[in-house]
Regions:
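The feature marks the mature, well-folded catalytic cores of soluble enzymes
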Residues: 1-247
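Intrinsic-disorder-associated, low-complexity terminal segments enriched in Asp/Asn/His/Tyr and depleted
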Residues: 253-254
């Protein structure tokens, strides 16, 4: 079926990667000396291949940490930030009748577990700073709460997500699953939604983000987590049922 709105798959061509840089006022502070080299390594690998958008409070500090790189491929935007999870607080790219749009949903720290007053404004600030191409149309999607890691698209009208996350307390608990489904189908131009009904992970602050459980690898392939350790608490938990749902309930995936 043709769609006016298309939510691209993970493998769709992109113009840049966005990173939100760790600093001493984030939760990474106690292990910042370990985290910064990791982000530097990620940044350098991205810069070798495409443009990199870095959101940070202090551009000078990040330049010192990066050292010698091709800065022609780096776009800096200075602003206050709470944390580093750009996949969750960042804008979600769609095409509406071919026009690129950037959806800006509410990000509230995974159901108000953590401070997100700055991160919730990042996409809006980036648009005000004219960071994106002039053809990109920003769209305010408030008051709906949605993190990028909570949805997965095959780019062909199918979206995968979890029941546990989208309707959780302090997100969109005022909506029934049927209402959530209608809304998501409308704004993302979907034919169907694959709801994972399991997905417990010990220590997970996201309430079962689908990107920690199952991912589309192609239009007909889903990769999912699986626990093989019989001593692990996940071996007989709901998490083990994720694979069964992926294998038995949905087509045309393998």
């Amino acid at each position: 079926m043709e769609h006016n709105v298309i939510l691209p798959a993970e493998w769709y061509p992109q113009s840049a990667v966005q990173l939100t840089w760790p600093h001493e006022n984030t939760d990474w502070a106690p292990i910042l000396d370990e985290v910064i080299p990791c982000f530097v390594a990620i940044a350098k690998e991205v810069i070798k291949r495409e443009k990199l958008l870095i959101v940070c409070p202090d551009e000078t500090a990040v330049r010192e940490q990066l050292g010698e790189v091709d800065y022609d491929r780096v776009i800096f935007r200075e602003m206050d930030t709470n944390d580093t999870w750009a996949r969750d607080h960042g804008g979600i790219s769609v095409f509406d009748e071919g026009t690129p749009m950037l959806y800006d949903f509410v990000f509230n720290g995974w159901g108000m577990k953590f401070a997100a007053n700055h991160d919730n404004l990042i996409t809006r600030n980036l648009c005000h700073m004219k960071t994106f191409s002039g053809e990109v149309v920003p769209a305010n999607m408030q008051p709906f709460v949605l993190e990028g890691g909570s949805i997965e698209s095959d780019g062909k009208g199918t979206l995968m997500t979890t029941v546990e996350c989208l309707a959780s307390v302090n997100r969109n608990e005022y909506l029934q699953q049927e209402e959530l489904e209608r809304y998501l189908k409308d704004v993302f131009g979907l034919d169907r939604i694959l709801w994972i009904t399991s997905g417990y992970l010990a220590g997970d602050d996201t309430d079962s983000h689908v990107d920690t459980l199952a991912r589309f690898c192609s239009e007909d392939t889903i990769a999912y987590v699986r626990c093989e350790d019989e001593e692990d608490e996940h071996y007989r938990s709901e998490e083990r049922r994720v694979g069964k749902e992926c294998r038995s309930r949905w087509s045309p995936y393998h």
